[in-house]
Amino acid sequence: MNNDRSTRKKLVALTFDDGPNTTTTNEVLDVLEKHGVVASFFLVGNNINSESAISVKRAYDLGCEINNHSRSHGYMDKMTAGEIKAEYGFVDEKVFEITGEHTKFFRPPYIAVGGLMWENISVPFISGLGCGDWDDNVTVERRVDVITEGVRDGSVILLHDAEGNRKTVEAVDKIIPALKEQGYKFVTVSGLFKAKGIAPVTKMIYSNALQKGMWG
């Protein structure tokens, strides 16, 4: 067991799905910069274009991690092996073109996982502590409360930077200082596993770096 002091720090990883775009993604980045923290972005390939790629590069240059959320955001548990590889590979290639790095983690759309996905995507899968923030009916206050009350050391926080999701931008601006007050530090998903001395494995879907079972 790794008893290094860094493994005993309270750490969380903010993550954002469904970008990139030139509006909400940049608003989230503004909040991250304001508070001096990093996050990880799980991109939908069909949203990557010459303009939104600038937001991706900005995130990367700020120290954020860029990961994979499929090309089309379809139900990949119902896809063939070839379709699954194409969904993952498209985003991985686009991210490499922008950042010079391959994606290290995959978040399955709808957290829907089937056997062929395990066999055809060779990186660890990531879920996370969510608050239903894809639903505009969920208030800013509810988003903040669910995250700040549910978070634990090692948590991956699952949020969305889809275009127009202003309530999550407002919520993140409150979540970050609230968790700092609780003693949490913010890292990327890769940084979370590294700091905890854990090597993430495939055929697992992590919502917390410290979980023991396949689903946490």
Language-model region placement:
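Active-site beta->alpha N-cap acidic-glycine motif
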Residues: 1-77, 83-84, 90, 94, ...
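A generic signature of intrinsically disordered, low-complexity regions enriched in glycine/proline
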Residues: 8, 21-22, 137, 165, ...
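Catalytic domains of cell-wall/extracellular-matrix polysaccharide-remodeling enzymes
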Residues: 27, 50, 58-61, 71-185, ...
